[in-house]
């Protein structure tokens, strides 16, 4: 569909430009011909003749034309008139262009099309009329384009469509009516479009869909009704769409979905009901959707989830329920979702998750529970989620991690616990996470780490502990992290680092110690980036090795790093990495790298 996937129009656009490769471009000068012995190219246009296909394309885009060129060659196959100031298309304007199969009139300030404007275009395949000022279209306008496969009328001012407007377009495949001002559609407006595969009605003002509206559209694959003013989804509206695969109902005003509203839609793979006002889901809301893979219900007003609500969705792979008002997850909430891979429940009001809430989710790989207020999670609440590899619990009011909170997550790769209030983590509570690669504990209230906290995490590569209240860090704690690559312990209260703290971490390449209370530090070999700023460094003899290391490796310990900037108005941002001396007094305020060699002469 043009709106969601780029659509045939974009494919054609690219195809024509690719075709220019072997073409001989002419016509940039008035009177230039498209071929040495061929027809003349219109003044102010550019012509391209493909020697391989023997097809002629005429480009008259953005020439500020107020009327159509008079001398368009009759052999033209593609005509680009977009971006002009045409106002209207008179009758029989293209009557001599019987070979034309592509016509682009988008963005040309068209206010009207005469009923016979398309006369003679019996071979036209693609017609672009989007981004104009059209308010109405005469019945019979398209009777002259029986071969039309793609018609785009999006972003006009259409307030109504007459019955019979699309009569005779039996080959139409793609129809885009999005971003107009349509309020009501005639019952039979789409009759005769038996081959239609993609229909866009997004961005209109539709408040109601009558049951007969989609009769005869048995081949339809995608239907976009997003960004309208629909208030409910009635039964039997979509019953005539047995082959529909994608249905977009997002960003409407829907408060209720009738029982069996989607009955018979066995081919449906994608259903988007996000950004509405749906308050509740019933057990009979989704019966019959045996082929559904994606269900999006985020940004609604759902307050609770009843058991067995999703029982018929055996092949569902993605379920989005974020940004609702769900308060509790009870047992068997997700029963029947054995193929589910992605479950998002972020930014609800969940305060309680009962053991058994996630039972049956044998294949779930990503779970997002962030933005709730769980405070604590019952032990073994994630039991049985053997294939879960990413668990998001950010900003969830967690204060404590119990011994068996994460029991059963043997395949977990990424655990996100940042922006909580975690002040304690029980010893070995992470021991079962043998496949963990990334652990994010940023912005919590940790003052110390249990000695065996990371026992069993031999595969961990990324450990983020910044913005806590750590005062000490023992070598025994980090010892098991043999594969640690990225270590961030910035913004803590560390005053000293234990001897040999990082010696066992031979793979560490990124180390951030900024914003602590460190006075000394011995550099580690193998580092690729070291952040040391905002510490009260004692620039006496013990820091000479760090000075030499920093001077010899400016790429590892840069004075500043410029953030990559994009856009014309983007201002570069610099992150500084100062090693500012707090003492002795004679070098106080200097950067360690600027302290002279004579200062260390007696070391």
From Swiss-Prot:
The record lists glycosylation at 64, 85, 96, 368, 515, 578, 586
UniProt LRR repeat ranges:
75-96, 99-120, 123-144, 147-168, 171-192, 195-216, 219-240, 243-264, 267-288, 291-312, 315-336, 339-360, 363-384, 387-408, 411-432, 435-456, 459-480, 483-504, 507-528
PANTHER family given in the database record? INSULIN-LIKE GROWTH FACTOR-BINDING PROTEIN COMPLEX ACID LABILE SUBUNIT, SLIT RELATED LEUCINE-RICH REPEAT NEURONAL PROTEIN
Q: Which GO terms describe its cellular component?
A: extracellular matrix; extracellular space; insulin-like growth factor ternary complex
Protein name listed in UniProt = Insulin-like growth factor-binding protein complex acid labile subunit
Give start and end of each LRRNT domain.
Answer: 32-74
Domain (LRRCT) ranges:
535-603
**SUPFAM superfamilies, alphabetically?**
L domain-like
Q: Which UniProt keywords apply?
A: Cell adhesion, Disulfide bond, Glycoprotein, Leucine-rich repeat, Repeat, Secreted, Signal
Pfam families the record matches:
LRR_8, LRRNT
Q: Name one GO molecular function term.
A: insulin-like growth factor binding
Where does this protein chiefly localize? secreted
List the subcellular locations.
Answer: Secreted, Extracellular space
Biological role stated in the UniProt entry: May have an important role in regulating the access of circulating IGFs to the tissues.
Q: How does it assemble?
A: Forms a ternary complex with IGF1 and IGFBP3.
In the UniProt record, the signal sequence range is 1-23
This protein's source sits in the domain of life called Eukaryota
Q: Which SMART domains match?
A: LRR_BAC, LRR_SD22, LRR_TYP, LRRCT, LRRNT
Q: A GO term (biological process) for this protein?
A: cellular response to epidermal growth factor stimulus
State the disulfide connectivity. Answer: 41-47, 45-60, 539-581, 541-603, 565-570
Summary of the tissues where the protein is detected: Brain, kidney, lung, heart, spleen, muscle and liver.
């Amino acid at each position: 569909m043009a709106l969601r996937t780029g659509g045939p129009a974009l494919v054609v656009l690219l195809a024509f430009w690719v075709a220019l490769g072997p073409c001989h471009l002419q016509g940039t000068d008035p009177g230039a011909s498209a071929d040495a012995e061929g027809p003349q190219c219109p003044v102010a246009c550019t012509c391209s003749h493909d020697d391989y296909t023997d097809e002629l394309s005429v480009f008259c885009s953005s020439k500020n034309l107020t009327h159509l060129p008079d001398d368009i060659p009759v052999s033209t196959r593609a005509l680009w008139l977009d971006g002009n100031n045409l106002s209207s298309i008179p009758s029989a304007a293209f009557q001599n262009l019987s070979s034309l199969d592509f016509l682009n009139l988008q963005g040309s300030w068209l206010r009207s099309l005469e009923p016979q404007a398309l006369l003679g275009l019996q071979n036209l395949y693609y017609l672009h009329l989007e981004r104009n000022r059209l308010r109405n279209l005469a019945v019979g306008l398209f009777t002259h384009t029986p071969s039309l496969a793609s018609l785009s009328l999006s972003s006009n001012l259409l307030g109504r469509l007459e019955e019979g407007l699309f009569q005779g377009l039996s080959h139409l495949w793609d129809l885009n009516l999005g971003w107009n001002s349509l309020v009501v559609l005639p019952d039979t407006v789409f009759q005769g479009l038996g081959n239609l595969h993609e229909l866009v009605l997004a961005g209109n003002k539709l408040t109601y869909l009558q049951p007969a509206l989609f009769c005869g559209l048995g081949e339809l694959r995608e239907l976009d009704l997003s960004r309208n003013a629909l208030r409910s989804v009635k039964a039997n509206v979509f019953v005539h769409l047995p082959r529909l695969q994608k249905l977009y109902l997002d960003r409407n005003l829907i408060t209720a979905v009738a029982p069996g509203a989607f009955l018979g839609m066995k081919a449906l793979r994608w259903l988007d009901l996000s950004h509405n006002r749906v308050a509740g889901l019933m057990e009979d809301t989704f019966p019959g959707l045996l082929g559904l893979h994606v269900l999006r219900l985020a940004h609604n007003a759902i307050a609770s989830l009843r058991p067995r609500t999703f029982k018929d969705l055996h092949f569902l792979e993605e379920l989005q329920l974020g940004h609702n008002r769900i308060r509790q997850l009870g047992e068997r909430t997700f029963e029947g979702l054995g193929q589910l891979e992605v479950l998002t429940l972020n930014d609800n009001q969940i305060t309680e998750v009962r053991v058994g809430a996630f039972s049956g989710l044998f294949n779930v790989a990503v779970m997002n529970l962030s933005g709730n207020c769980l405070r604590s999670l019952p032990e073994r609440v994630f039991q049985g989620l053997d294939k879960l590899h990413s668990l998001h619990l950010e900003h969830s009011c967690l204060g404590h991690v119990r011994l068996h909170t994460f029991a059963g997550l043997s395949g977990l790769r990424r655990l996100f616990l940042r922006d909580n209030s975690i002040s304690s983590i029980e010893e070995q509570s992470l021991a079962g996470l043998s496949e963990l690669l990334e652990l994010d504990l940023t912005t919590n209230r940790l003052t110390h780490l249990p000695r065996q906290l990371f026992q069993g995490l031999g595969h961990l590569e990324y450990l983020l502990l910044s913005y806590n209240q750590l005062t000490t860090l023992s070598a025994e704690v980090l010892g098991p992290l043999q594969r640690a690559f990225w270590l961030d312990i910035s913004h803590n209260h560390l005053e000293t680092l234990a001897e040999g703290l990082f010696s066992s971490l031979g793979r560490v390449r990124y180390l951030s110690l900024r914003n602590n209370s460190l006075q000394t530090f011995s550099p580690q070999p193998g580092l690729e980036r070291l952040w040391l700023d905002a510490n009260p460094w004692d620039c006496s003899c013990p820091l000479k090795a760090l000075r030499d290391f920093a001077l010899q490796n400016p790429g590892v310990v840069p004075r500043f790093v410029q953030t990559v900037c994009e856009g014309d108005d983007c201002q570069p941002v610099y992150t500084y990495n100062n090693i500012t001396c707090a003492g002795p007094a004679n070098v106080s305020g200097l950067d360690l790298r600027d302290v002279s060699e004579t200062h260390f002469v007696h070391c």
